[in-house]
């Protein structure tokens, strides 16, 4: 399995923040949830399920930023690669 330390690193967040999310003491933003999806290596379907479950808007391919994120999820990119692509396309990064 993936340790909390490794998940935190791959998700671009601190272990403390990650622990607070899992303990229900934090209500992460849509972008933070997507960071977590990349850290977990989630599929697009799993990411959409998590967003829906947490009451966030699903990724929508006609929105440029979302399309870049979808591409990253479909191609198994890591969070940092997707963030670089978002930045280079003048879109808001995930963190």
Which functions belong to the PLM regions below?
Residues 48-77:
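Short, charged recognition helix plus adjacent turn
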Residues 1-8, 35:
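Short basic helix-loop element that most often maps to the first helix and adjoining turn
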Residues 11-28, 53-55:
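Recognition helix of helix-turn-helix/homeodomain-like DNA-binding domains
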Residues 10, 39:
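Residues within the alpha-helical elements of helix-turn-helix
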Residues 1-4, 80-95:
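A short, Lys/Arg-rich alpha-helix, primarily the initiator
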């Amino acid at each position: 399995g993936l340790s909390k330390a490794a998940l935190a690193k791959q998700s671009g967040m601190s272990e403390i923040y990650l622990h607070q999310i899992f303990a229900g003491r934090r209500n992460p933003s849509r972008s933070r949830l997507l960071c977590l999806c990349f850290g977990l290596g989630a599929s697009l379907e799993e990411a959409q399920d998590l967003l829906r479950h947490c009451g966030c808007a699903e990724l929508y391919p006609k929105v440029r930023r979302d399309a870049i994120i979808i591409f990253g999820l479909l191609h198994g990119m890591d969070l940092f690669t997707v963030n670089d692509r978002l930045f280079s396309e003048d879109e808001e990064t995930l963190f």
